[in-house]
């Protein structure tokens, strides 16, 4: 080799070493456990308090009261929308001193533990205070007159009606389930039972005798009475009353053909405990429902009842429609459960098992006839909202996606269409209120403003005579509104993922009456918090816009390169993508602090608040439909931002997101390098029938006059042999929603494919992981720190961050 060749080879070697050194430097990160520790759920709850208002409307006026907590304590206010005033209910310093004098235990304003605050007769508040320590604790009840600011002690009020009774609207008697049948008590016995269920003077009367185990009254269509229930009174499911309290309707479900499922709680006591419950899986025989109408003969004379013929489809779903609750209902001593309709009839919805056919029906209580008022038919599945009756029930406001978008239609009571009240390429979420006197409705909708994120909800007014939507609230925010009963005013909670939550009061004309509150995030910002960044990318089709949020480490350095982790939930009922601000950001903001970029982004087939095409994109392809969009979104962000390392990509999700994250690392094994998959429904053939059949589809086969249902779906175990990266599977061992068998089947497939993987079982935990969420977080942080960052405390036996919290 000549001298020139030697020099050339030496330069190539030096250049290669430099490249390797640069690559090693870019990957050599330190996981920032301390920053993630600073924003634990416990610590965030000590820094951030109220972020939204729940207005408690007065019974006989448009006033409302609310509470608001900050680092300075809790304040209580009464708002008069007509006058545009906000008045503080209590002088908290004075109240604390008064309470201290009464209970002989010291309190100060910032730490006054007011509980069970209730408004009575629009004139006074009652509340309770617990004072003392440990075994020397007392509860003292108070009455506070609003007009005079007078404070008195009062006897402690217990519930006047037991919670296991469905009380008639007039309060004179209540129906409950016991064993497999229905029973009734008058108000005198109900009040006695509220004080002491063992009172020997309580009188109860049996209404039915034909109920048997697994085919009884008072249970839902996916449950059934057990031996332990035979002597226990409980609230009767699916029972609605006529307004005059003379009748009620209820369902009786035959669930005897539903198979049992089991979980074993290994830590509940001395012996592991078997828990048995009914659980219908896709394609399995379904329950059969029977609708009954009861006519009360008085609490002492029982009731007469008859079956109402309602069957239209095999294994149909039946839902009895309830009337909307009003502010006055909240001041009753019992939960009012009135049917939608009047004294002459009520409404029910029946839907075919494949959910492609839905009928809104009215049942006439005198003729026992069932009439279909509105029918909906789809080739995927029909969704619906509870109808809104106006004109004394003569007209119906009906929500439908029949034109590919969710809109509101006005019908006459006989089922004839009057007009479309809304019509456009946007999504109406719900009717907030109706003012018939002035002829308008208030509704929440998104996607109307085409220059905004289409998920951002707004409040609109539309005339009952039809016309253009009038937006009443602020632009470029996600708004959650609550309207007064007469729909003259509404309280708007608004924020964005990158905007501090605030609350404003509006009139139905769009006048901004008052800015009520802004969340105090000062302590959070002092700790180093920074808002995430919103972004927009394209779906894999290159056409559909997808929206997301990017969470960076709070010590972000733009000159460094970071791994990226995608927090996912595929839908179809919701996406993981955050639109409004929330302090519950453990799996996004907090996870990023160990030293990663974390994103959330939608995908076709995800959120229902866009077009029906977008929402139903995954129909028939429930495993893979969102994966390509997630991958392409990450690739676009990597091309857009030089600080993102596309060679270190992670993915994480819970429930449907656990299913999706595992599918992603198996479907694209060269792209996703690490996945943490929690409580995933990895095999939807053993997940619950309703969700799986709705969102994937079920084939209805009719042969020789009988209808059967066939379900087939792709699963994660089928592609387990594709694993190349690092996968951690997590499940609670008594998850009775997504059964642990979903994860075990993936484990079985991985073992048989000779794959290494990690698994974490959380003992005694249900679907949400309960009190082991903090432990889970650090195990997840360890996993990504090891496989994406290259610096982990995974091998240390103690999680010191939990010991410090």
Regions found by a protein language model. Give the residues of each.
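Short intrinsically disordered, low-complexity segments
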Residues: 20-22, 40, 644
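Glycine-centered structural positions embedded in regular secondary structure
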Residues: 19, 36, 218-220, 510, ...
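Serine-hydrolase catalytic core recognition
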Residues: 55, 260, 334-335, 343, ...
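Residue-level detector of intrinsically disordered/flexible regions characterized by low predicted structural confidence
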Residues: 4-8, 12-14, 145, 162, ...
């Amino acid at each position: 080799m000549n001298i020139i060749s030697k020099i050339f080879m030496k330069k190539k070697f030096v250049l290669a070493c430099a490249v390797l050194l640069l690559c090693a430097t870019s990957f050599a990160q330190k996981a920032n456990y301390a920053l993630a520790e600073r924003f634990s759920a416990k610590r965030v709850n000590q820094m951030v308090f109220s972020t939204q208002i729940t207005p408690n409307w007065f019974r006989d006026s448009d006033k409302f009261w609310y509470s608001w907590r900050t680092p300075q304590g809790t304040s209580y206010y009464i708002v008069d929308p007509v006058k545009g005033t906000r008045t503080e209910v209590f002088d908290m310093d004075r109240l604390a001193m008064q309470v201290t004098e009464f209970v002989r235990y010291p309190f100060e304003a910032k730490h006054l533990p007011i509980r069970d605050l209730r408004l009575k007769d629009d004139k006074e508040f009652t509340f309770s205070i617990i004072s003392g320590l440990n075994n020397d604790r007392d509860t003292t009840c108070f009455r506070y007159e609003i007009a005079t600011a007078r404070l008195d002690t009062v006897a402690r009020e217990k519930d006047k009606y037991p919670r296991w009774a469905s009380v008639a609207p007039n309060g004179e008697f209540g129906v409950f389930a016991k064993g497999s049948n229905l029973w009734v008590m008058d108000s005198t016995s109900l009040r006695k039972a509220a004080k002491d269920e063992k009172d020997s003077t309580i009188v109860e009367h049996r209404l039915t005798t034909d109920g048997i185990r697994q085919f009884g009254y008072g249970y839902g269509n996916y449950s059934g009475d057990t031996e332990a229930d035979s002597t226990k009174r409980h609230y009767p499911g699916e029972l609605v009353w006529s307004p005059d309290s003379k009748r009620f309707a209820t369902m009786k479900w035959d669930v005897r053909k539903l198979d049992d499922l089991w979980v074993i709680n290994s830590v509940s006591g001395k012996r592991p405990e078997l828990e048995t419950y009914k659980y219908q899986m896709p394609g399995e025989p379904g329950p059969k429902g029977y609708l009954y109408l009861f006519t009360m003969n008085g609490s002492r004379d029982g009731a007469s009842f008859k079956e109402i013929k309602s069957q239209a489809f095999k294994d149909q779903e039946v839902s009895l429609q309830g009337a909307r609750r009003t502010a006055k209902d909240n001041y009753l001593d019992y939960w009012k459960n009135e049917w939608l309709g009047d004294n002459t009839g009520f409404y029910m919805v029946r839907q075919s098992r494949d959910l492609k056919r839905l009928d809104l029906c009215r049942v006439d209580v005198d003729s026992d006839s069932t009439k279909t008022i509105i029918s909906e038919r789809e080739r995927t599945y029909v969704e619906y909202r509870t109808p809104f009756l106006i004109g004394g029930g003569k007209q119906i406001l009906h929500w439908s996606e029949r034109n590919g978008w969710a809109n509101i239609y006005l019908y006459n009571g006989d089922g004839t269409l009057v007009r479309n009240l809304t019509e456009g390429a946007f999504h109406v979420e719900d009717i907030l209120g109706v003012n018939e006197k002035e002829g308008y409705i208030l509704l929440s909708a998104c996607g109307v403003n085409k220059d905004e994120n289409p998920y951002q909800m707004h409040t609109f007014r539309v005339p009952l005579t039809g016309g253009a939507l009038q937006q009443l609230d602020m632009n470029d925010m996600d708004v959650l509104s609550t309207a007064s009963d007469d729909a003259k005013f509404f309280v708007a909670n608004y924020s964005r993922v990158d905007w501090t939550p605030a609350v404003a009061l509006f009139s139905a004309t769009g006048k901004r009456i008052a800015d009520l509150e802004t969340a105090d995030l000062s302590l959070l910002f002092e700790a180093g918090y920074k808002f995430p960044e919103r972004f927009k990318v394209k779906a894999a089709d290159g056409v559909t816009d997808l929206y997301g949020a990017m969470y960076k480490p709070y010590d972000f350095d733009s000159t460094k390169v970071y791994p990226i982790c995608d927090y996912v939930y595929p839908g179809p009922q919701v996406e993981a993508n955050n639109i409004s601000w929330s302090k519950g950001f453990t799996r996004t903001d907090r996870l990023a602090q160990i030293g990663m970029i974390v994103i959330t982004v939608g995908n076709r087939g995800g959120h229902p608040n866009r077009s029906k095409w977008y929402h139903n994109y995954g129909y028939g392809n429930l495993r893979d439909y969102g994966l390509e969009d997630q991958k392409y979104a990450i690739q676009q962000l990597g091309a857009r931002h030089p600080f993102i390392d596309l060679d270190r990509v992670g993915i994480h999700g819970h429930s449907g997101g656990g299913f999706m994250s595992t599918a992603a690392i198996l479907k694209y094994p060269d792209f996703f390098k690490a996945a943490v998959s929690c409580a995933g429904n990895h095999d939807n053939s053993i997940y619950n029938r309703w969700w799986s059949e709705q969102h994937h589809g079920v084939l209805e086969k009719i042969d020789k006059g009988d209808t059967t249902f066939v379900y087939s779906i792709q699963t994660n175990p089928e592609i387990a042999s594709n694993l190349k990266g690092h996968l951690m599977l997590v499940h609670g061992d008594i998850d009775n929603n997504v059964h642990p068998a979903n994860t075990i089947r993936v484990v079985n497939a991985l073992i048989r494919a000779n794959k290494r993987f990690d698994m974490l079982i959380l003992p005694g935990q249900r679907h949400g992981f309960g009190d082991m969420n903090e432990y889970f977080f650090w195990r997840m942080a360890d996993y990504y720190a090891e496989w994406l960052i290259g610096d982990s405390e995974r091998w240390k036996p103690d999680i010191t961050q939990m010991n410090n919290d």
